[in-house]
Amino acid sequence: MHATVARQWIERWDRQQEVSLPEREDRFIALIDAVQEATGMADPLVLDVGCGPGSLGIRLLERLPGATVIGIDADPVTLALGRAAHGDRITFTSIDLRDPGWPSRLPVDRPADAAVSTTALHWLTEDALRAFYRTLADVLRPGGVFLNGDHLHENPGTAPVLARLGRALNELEDQRRFPVGHGESWTGWWDSVTADPALAPLAAERAALNVGADHSSSEAILLSVHVDALRAAGFAEVGTLWQRGANRLLCAIRLAPPTRPRAASPLSGRAIPGGGAR
C-alpha cells in the first residue's frame, strides 16, 4: 500500500475517533507530557499497546524524536496502514495481548521505560486484562511508567450512585455534542474498509482472527478493575492524572526492587592513625 493512501485512511480514522472522543488530542498531550516527565529521557523505549495505525506513537515521536516506539496490535488492517504510513519511524509488531507469551515476540533487548495505551484495553475480559498486566510488569523496568487513556467507569457494585450519575452525564453530554449526521462512525469506517478492494482481504483476515469480538468487555471498562489488577501485578502507585468525566488517563508506576541496606565497611568505626573514627 502506498504511504499516501495509508495516510488518507488514517486521517479518516482520526476523524471518526474524534467524533466520540472530542478531548482525544488533549488526552494525547497529557499522556505524552507524562511520558516525558516520568522517564526524564530524550530517548525512552516505549511500548504502544493496542497501537492501531500509530496515531499516538507518531505524536509521541513528534515530541520525543529520539524515542524508540514499538507498536503492538493484533489487527491486520490497522497494522498495515501504520506500517505503510509510519513504518520508517515506528516498529509495528503483530501481537495478540490475550497470548500469555506475547513478551517473547517483542523486538527489544531491554526492559521498556514506558508503556502506553489509548482506547484499546477495554475489549479484554477481566481475566485477560489481569494476565496482561502481570506480564506487562515483567517487561517494564523498575520505576517504569504505564499510562492508559480510556473511558473507565465507577463500579456500580460498590458505588451505584456515582456509577449511575457518571453514565447519565456521559449520555447527556453525548446528546449535546453529537446531533444526527455528526460524522463518520466507527462502524461506518470499518464498512468502508471492507468495501475497499485493497483492504478487503485484510478485513477478512481480521474477521477470521476474531479481533475486537469482545469489544467493550463489561469488566474491563471499570476503573476499579484496572486499579486492582495493576496493584496485584506489582505496580506501586496507581492513580488518575487527567480526567473528563469517565474519560481519564490512568497512570501506574512499576514497583522498584527494595533497596538493600549497605553492608558496613570493615573499617567502620576503626581508629585511623592521626585522626578520629570515620
Predicted feature residues:
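Core SAM-dependent methyltransferase catalytic element
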Residues: 233-278
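Conserved class I S-adenosyl-L-methionine
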Residues: 1-42, 55-59, 147-176, 181-185
